[in-house]
Amino acid sequence: MAKRVYAIAMRYAQALYELAKEQKSLDKWQEDLQDLSSLTEDASVAEFLSNPKIASARKHKVLAKLSNIDPLMLNLVDMLVATRRLGIMRAVSGEYNRLLNEARGVEDAIVTTAKPSSEADIEIIRQQLSKITGKKINVVTATDPGLIAGLKARIGDKLIDGSVSRRLVLLQNEISQGRI
């Protein structure tokens, strides 16, 4: 089921990306998608949009008034509502961002540290990850006190684990196997 949703979201995102590229509106559409994604995750908005008793034209007008979104983007919402796929809006937005980042040579890195990092530390991490990947890195930070110290960085499907908790697990394995 998840693969099917991803495949559908990917098709929508690819079509949107091509259209935005054609109209030279890549960044604007990225913002619009993020706004729509947040808006459609609101329970009352999702309920309103999914209500079959409310005419599509009225839904369209309300969305247009709620946001400053490109009319073509509103057509996407109309289509998702009509096909009962409004729930994939977040996936469409995420896939669009991935396509945009890929075209620009940018990769997202989720960096988790034991405690919040300073901007200077984040910049150093960004530079190091950029050297490793050869791409520009967009850092998203998270904290997990369970790491004790160090960091974990997830870039796509790769994980760089430089945490003290991971080193302790490795040390424990070495001791339990009698290597130390």
From Swiss-Prot:
Keywords: ATP synthesis, Cell membrane, CF(1), Hydrogen ion transport, Ion transport, Membrane, Transport
Ubl conjugation among keywords: no
Disulphide bonds in the chain: none
Keyword Cell membrane: yes
Compartment annotation: Cell membrane
Transmembrane segments: none
GO MF terms, alphabetically ordered: proton-transporting ATP synthase activity, rotational mechanism
Membrane topology value: Peripheral membrane protein
One GO term describing the cellular component: plasma membrane
Domain of life: Bacteria
Protein family per UniProt: Belongs to the ATPase delta chain family.
Main function: F(1)F(0) ATP synthase produces ATP from ADP in the presence of a proton or sodium gradient. F-type ATPases consist of two structural domains, F(1) containing the extramembraneous catalytic core and F(0) containing the membrane proton channel, linked together by a central stalk and a peripheral stalk. During catalysis, ATP synthesis in the catalytic domain of F(1) is coupled via a rotary mechanism of the central stalk subunits to proton translocation. This protein is part of the stalk that links CF(0) to CF(1). It either transmits conformational changes from CF(0) to CF(1) or is implicated in proton conduction.
Subunit and partners: F-type ATPases have 2 components, F(1) - the catalytic core - and F(0) - the membrane proton channel. F(1) has five subunits: alpha(3), beta(3), gamma(1), delta(1), epsilon(1). F(0) has three main subunits: a(1), b(2) and c(10-14). The alpha and beta chains form an alternating ring which encloses part of the gamma chain. F(1) is attached to F(0) by a central stalk formed by the gamma and epsilon chains, while a peripheral stalk is formed by the delta and b chains.
NCBIfam families cross-referenced by the UniProt entry: ATP_synt_delta
UniProt cross-references to HAMAP family, sorted A to Z: ATP_synth_delta_bact (MF_01416)
Family matches, as PANTHER family: ATP SYNTHASE DELTA CHAIN
Protein name stated in the entry: ATP synthase subunit delta
Encoding gene (name): atpH
